[in-house]
Regions:
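Transmembrane alpha-helices of multi-pass inner-membrane enzymes
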Residues: 47, 361-373, 379-405
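Aromatic-anchored transmembrane helix interface
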Residues: 68-83, 93-117, 126-133, 137
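Alpha-helical transmembrane segments of multi-pass inner-membrane proteins
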Residues: 123-154, 166-235
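Hydrophobic alpha-helical membrane-interfacial segments at the cytosolic entry of transmembrane helices
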Residues: 73-76, 130-139, 203-206, 239-260
Length: 405
């Protein structure tokens, strides 16, 4: 019972951290302000000291009964932390630049640190993590709408600016855009008036995120959301036709009320694709490969944490990031680090697939943002990516379903 209570407190702390993250912080904050300090403190309290020490010393490798993904994950974390860190120190990169690489690495490996601590209360922990991510996503969307001066009429007319801190790049925005309408429609189809009111609020929150992504013409996020809704629609057509009728009715009503915005947004996506193409991702990959091939040491171990890359995607400026996880890992950690990363994510992939089978709504809500973050987006460095991975693994391990829809 004590273990369950501690797990609940950890999950509650993570929920509060996510709420503060969405309402007061940024996906990639430039400095540590009071909000970031509080979020960091809550994360440290959630993780504790014992689990990181066990991971750092290799004690977790001796534990029996661990799921098959944990051992390769712990080994991958050791390789990706220490080899590039020593390489960065050897090449005398700036300490601040090294920290900006190491912290996102720890975010990405949050499942290693958090999942074992939350297993004592998986149901509540999954609910709190999912709720926190949804609130964070809506918070980011609201703040973006505020800086856009609530210009809903501009959607489909012109591409709206992302803003200086790229609030909509947070994977939690796409998570909320998929999860909230999906769960909300289910809540509308059955239950009392309180449940239906909550369903209306969920649908509106999700639509707020979706329309924001359409206004800023986030092509990949919109495409992944469309795939998720199509997959869920086909599933529900067989299992819950009433929910499909409800969702179809809402979609038809919105298309009837706002045809210019809907078709205009589709036109904006097509126009951006024509003008921007792949957003110089191929040129960026070529630059990362060139840096990796600059020497045998760079090929094996990369240039280390803290290295900068002359990135064609940002006009040739020397920056600490690339826009895809593969090129980032290749440039910074070399082939050795890239193999460790593949082993880690490959170990988690069956968990995500299992979640798609056991809880399709949560599975699709998690899969879309993760595909975006880990495939072709800088958001692989963000806090919510690591917590989405944590949510997926924890939910899959316990066959968790959120409240009946």
């Amino acid at each position: 019972m004590a273990g369950k209570g501690v797990a609940l407190w950890r999950a509650a702390g993570l929920f509060v951290a996510l709420v503060l993250y969405g309402l007061l912080s940024a996906p990639a904050p430039a400095e540590i302000r009071p909000a970031e300090a509080v979020i960091g403190a809550l994360l440290v309290l959630g993780v504790g000291l014992l689990r990181p020490l066990c991971v750092a010393t290799g004690q977790t490798l001796l534990e029996r009964g661990s799921p098959p993904w944990e051992m390769p994950a712990v080994l991958a974390l050791a390789v990706l932390l220490w080899c590039p860190l020593m390489r960065g120190v050897w090449l005398d990169w700036a300490p601040g630049d090294m920290v900006r690489d190491v912290v996102p690495l720890l975010y990405l490996f949050l499942p290693v640190l958090l999942v074992p601590l939350l297993r004592a209360a998986p149901d509540r922990a999954v609910g709190l993590l999912a709720g926190g991510l949804a609130v964070a996503g809506v918070g980011f969307a609201l703040r973006w709408w505020k800086q856009a001066e609530w210009g809903f009429g501009a959607v489909g007319v012109r591409a709206m600016a992302d803003g200086g801190v790229y609030l909509l790049n947070a994977p939690s925005v796409l998570f909320a855009a998929i999860a909230l309408p999906a769960f909300g429609v289910g809540m509308l189809t059955r239950g009392g008036w309180l449940r239906r009111a909550a369903g209306v609020a969920a649908v509106l929150g999700g639509l707020l995120c979706l329309v924001a992504l359409a206004g800023a013409v986030h092509r990949m996020a919109l495409g992944l959301a469309a795939i998720a809704f199509a997959a869920l629609g086909l599933l529900w057509l067989r299992r819950a036709p009433l929910a499909v009728l409800g969702a179809g009715g809402i979609a038809l009503l919105l298309a009837t009320l706002f045809p210019e915005a809907l078709f205009g947004a589709l036109g904006q996506v097509a126009e951006k694709t024509r003008l921007a193409g792949a957003n110089t991702r191929w040129e960026e990959a070529e630059a990362a490969l060139g840096q990796a091939l600059s020497s045998p040491a760079a090929f094996l171990f990369g240039q280390g944490w803290g290295a900068l890359l002359a990135n064609p995607a940002v006009g040739g400026w020397r920056v600490s990031y690339t826009h895809t996880l593969v090129t980032y890992a290749l440039a910074k950690t070399g082939v050795v680090g890239l193999c460790a990363l593949i082993a880690y994510l490959g170990g988690l992939a069956p968990r995500v697939l299992a979640l798609l089978r056991s809880d399709p709504v949560l599975g699709w809500a998690v899969s879309g943002p993760l595909l975006m973050a880990l495939g072709a987006h800088t958001s692989f460095k963000y806090l919510d990516t690591g917590l989405l991975l944590t949510l997926a693994v924890l939910a899959a391990e316990r066959g968790k379903r959120l409240p009946p829809r």
